[in-house]
Regions:
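Extended, non-globular alpha-helical segments
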Residues: 1-7, 134-153, 211
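Small/aliphatic-rich secondary-structure junction motif
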Residues: 2-62, 162-207, 220-230, 251, ...
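A short acidic, glycine-rich active-site loop
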Residues: 62-75
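Charged docking surfaces used in two-component/phosphorelay signaling
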Residues: 95-103, 234-241
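Glycine-rich phosphate-binding loop signature in dinucleotide/nucleotide-binding domains
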Residues: 107-113, 247-251
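Short beta-strand elements of ligand-binding domains
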Residues: 118-120, 145-152, 257, 284-288
Length: 315
């Protein structure tokens, strides 16, 4: 594991909040919490897409409409940045034009940003919450942690126990995402639960124990271990079980284990990560990886001893 890379993503010097301005109410509390935890500077970025200028309101003077939109966005972000600085949080803002995904990725490269916070607020024809196209493309293509936040997010009460849920897949090497989750929990003095969901396979009674053993083995590789994680193994459909666990335990953060990044939106939308992000009520970190784990002779991924069963323990 590259320790320099790990340190950069777990303790970033700057955090980028990519906002459409309508989502600031639920993005800012998350950004503030993470900035306080890491000491990072907050960047606020709004990108005005080309279609924003093609409207009835722009009429015969599209240039005037462009400048009005730009100045208005600048004023909003400047006011927010000032408020954060008055709260002793380092913050700066910028407004750009053209295509949001390209501009956000360009900004990340230019400023060496190691963490992105973005909203997920698109809705389908039946009103079902989906991941907006900008957030979806960023999740699929970036190699830094992306924290997605939905409009249903509510800041937890101050006296509420701080919990982090790490949903681990053993199909892909989860080492750096596991360490990321452990470091998040240690930095915020949070209770960490590691959840592995195995699809039903009634013929292998030792597989739940095998998954537990594999997770414990991964944890032993982390030094120093500053938290004592709880380990849970459940059976069922992975996305459904992860969402159910979030609803039951109400974590402040969800970390999804490394999943294979795909340039194809159809492939991503069919996967566990997309369905979980679109449904859970808490901010969710994703850390993509294209590296698959080799099959083990004693443990086969995504199967368990008994349908509907769960196993738990503490490391």
């Amino acid at each position: 594991m590259n320790t320099t890379y790990l340190s950069a993503i777990t303790r970033p010097q700057s955090i980028l909040v990519a906002t459409d301005l309508n989502d600031l109410d639920f993005l800012l509390p998350v950004a503030i919490d993470q900035a306080k935890m890491t000491g990072a500077m907050i960047w606020l970025l709004h990108v005005i897409p080309p279609e924003a200028y093609v409207s009835i309101e722009s009429g015969a003077y599209p240039f005037v409409a462009k400048e009005k939109e730009y100045r208005s966005a600048e004023a909003v972000l400047a006011e927010v940045a000032l408020e954060l600085r008055q709260r002793n949080l380092a913050c700066a803002s910028e407004v750009r034009r053209l295509y949001p995904v390209d501009e956000i990725k360009g900004f990340i490269r230019e400023h060496s940003v190691k963490r992105l916070i973005v909203g997920t607020s698109a809705r389908g024809k039946l009103g079902k919450l989906l991941i907006g196209s900008v957030a979806e493309q960023l999740i699929r293509s970036l190699d830094i942690p992306v924290c997605t936040v939905g409009p249903h997010f509510e800041a937890p009460a101050p006296n509420r126990p701080h919990r982090i849920l790490f949903a681990v897949s053993l199909r892909h090497h989860p080492e750096h995402s596991l360490r990321f989750a452990v470091d998040l929990a240690a930095a915020s003095a949070a209770e960490l639960t590691i959840l592995h969901v195995a699809e039903q396979d009634l013929g292998d009674e030792g597989l739940a124990a095998g998954a537990m053993s594999r997770i414990e083995e991964l944890l032993r590789q982390i030094e120093p271990m500053l938290v004592r994680p709880h380990i849970r193994v459940r059976s069922g459909e992975p996305a459904e079980e992860i969402v159910a666990e979030c609803m039951a335990s109400e974590p402040q953060l969800l970390v999804l284990s490394a999943f294979q990044a795909s340039p194809l939106s159809a492939t991503f939308r069919a996967g566990v990560a997309y369905r979980v992000i679109a449904q859970v009520p808490c901010p969710t970190f994703t850390l993509p990886s294209g590296s698959k784990a080799r099959p083990s002779g004693t443990y086969r991924e995504f199967s368990t001893a008994q349908a509907g069963s769960s196993h738990s323990g503490q490391f």
